[in-house]
A protein has these predicted regions:
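A short core secondary-structure module
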Residues: 30, 34-78
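Glycine-rich beta->alpha junctions and the first turn(s) of the following alpha-helix
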Residues: 76-177
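Structural signature of FAD isoalloxazine-binding scaffolds in flavoprotein oxidoreductases
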Residues: 15-19, 70, 96, 100-102
Length: 180
């Protein structure tokens, strides 16, 4: 089965704690969930989704709880698959909850500890996202160095011109910084 991670919301931008998706605890221990999440990788095909929702707005980040959502249950809806310029091997969509009932068994960890869980996943994920960028940059740098040695202008390789050397040096400095 394929899973997904649902933290981002249409209006929250980079502030993940500014979420509006709410989970209201019921007398029987279940939660009724309402709200939207956006840019959910594997959302169009996921059977299970780890969802983060506000259970206590007064507590900020400590009022966010994680849930394991079964997309086959009533109250869960998928939006259209979003067009993307890259990383098209994994489909992305918006998801919506309308009176989705999550049982107490669907809570991951403890009530209010969801954001701590999300942060741990995000920290590891950021390395995974940055790594391909560094690899692509390394390849671009090598290609640029080869090109400036080969391409000639005014009878000499363009790599002999000071402005080109400065651009290549800047590229190398930025690449070295990214690799750290």
């Amino acid at each position: 089965e394929i899973g997904a991670f649902a933290l981002t919301e249409p209006q929250s931008g980079s502030d993940a704690t500014a979420m509006r998706c709410k989970a209201v605890k019921q007398a029987d221990g279940s939660y009724v969930i309402n709200g939207k999440k956006s840019w959910i990788t594997s959302g169009p095909v996921a059977r299970y989704i780890i969802l983060f929702a506000v259970t206590d707005p007064a507590k900020g980040a400590k009022g966010i709880t994680a849930f394991m959502i079964d997309t086959a249950k009533p109250g869960f809806h998928r939006g259209k698959t979003e067009p993307k310029l890259g990383i098209r091997a994994s489909a992305t969509c918006e998801i919506e909850f309308q009176d989705y009932v999550a049982t107490a068994d669907e809570v991951l960890g403890e009530d209010g500890h969801g954001f701590k869980l999300a942060r741990g996943v995000l920290d590891a994920g950021r390395i995974g996202i940055a790594s391909p960028g560094v690899g692509l940059s390394r390849g671009a740098y090598k290609a640029a160095v080869a090109y400036v040695k080969e391409r000639k202008s005014f009878g000499q390789p363009i790599g002999s011109f000071q402005m080109i050397q400065a651009k290549i040096a800047d590229m190398k400095c930025r690449l070295d910084a990214a690799e750290i």
